[in-house]
Amino acid sequence: MGSLNESSKVLVIGGTGYLGKRLVKASLDAGHDTYVMHRPEIGVDIEKVQLLLSFKMQGAHLVSASFDDHRSLVDAVSLVDVVICAISGVHIRSHQILLQLKLVQAIKEAGNVKRFLPSEFGTDPARMGDAMEPGRVTFDDKMVVRRAIEEAAIPFTYVSANCFAGYFLGGLCQPGSILPSRDHVTLLGDGNQKGVYVDENDIAAYTLKAIDDPRTLNKTLYIKPPKNILSQRQVVGIWEKHIGKQLHKTLLSEQDFLAAMKEQDYAEQVGLTHYYHVCYEGCLTNFEVEQDQEASKLYPDVRYTTVEEYLKRYV
């Protein structure tokens, strides 16, 4: 398919979401002709409408299309060189990963898309074949989409961005918390398993760097900034340094975590399973990544936000 040029036309699907709006901004900032797909039936969701209008005022093109209307999807993807999908894969919101199978069909029919980046942006599902129920559904569904992409011979890049900083750092790696306490923290296990934390704006910036890079064609791009590979204890230590105070610490054993998880509803259990694999098993750091697949090595011009810098906003 060859490499793309800097004027590649980009379609973002899910562009009003938590990561999607950052992808739209990164695409515009990079100078791409940017298209944002939205459903025809927005209703009275005023915040979504205002966000779409703000994209338009910044130079983006709004494209009306629906997963329930195959022809509209084909028409939408026919406008661009690159399709980035950021629809939700989070069960506590709306788990929509398999909707992308309709998108794969549309891209295959259109025949013009030079790169497709499906909704991934977390743990690499190809490495989670032994994941626990019920959380493994996220990885299983993403692998179904991957197989469909590859069987359709659609050029792709998968982005594994690990832990969103807003969710993990904001709560000091504690599930169900997105603001750091100044008094107490619960350490998962001994708090020494390392995770990888990435500012969502950096995820978007690295993603847009990758879309026209021949080095990332038909590969997985891992975003693992070296300074952000830290244990929960290290994250807490940085926060304590910022506030000039030691937190009271409680340890939560693996057994107690799993017992508490079983008392939650299905959607909560899915998310907690992911915390379990990251914070008790170290699933993000138990393998090596080739330098030509790691974003901060490929794109040293992107100045990523460190954990220390990120946590300062909460002081």
Swiss-Prot record:
Name of the protein in question: Bifunctional pinoresinol-lariciresinol reductase
Reactions this protein catalyses: (+)-lariciresinol + NADP(+) = (+)-pinoresinol + NADPH + H(+); (-)-secoisolariciresinol + NADP(+) = (+)-lariciresinol + NADPH + H(+)
Keyword rRNA-binding recorded: no
Gene Ontology MF term list: lariciresinol reductase activity; pinoresinol reductase activity
Source species, domain of life: Eukaryota
Oligomer status and interactors: Dimer.
Pfam family, one: NmrA
Anything else known: Knock-down mutants of PLR_Lc1 show unequivocally that (-)-hinokinin is synthesized via the (-)-secoisolariciresinol/(-)-matairesinol pathway and not via the piperitol/sesamin pathway.
Residues given in the record as NADP(+) binding sites: G14, G15, T16, G17, Y18, L19, G20, R39, K48, R146
Annotated gene: PLR_Lc1
Binding sites annotated in the UniProt record for substrate: H274
One GO biological process term: (+)-pinoresinol catabolic process
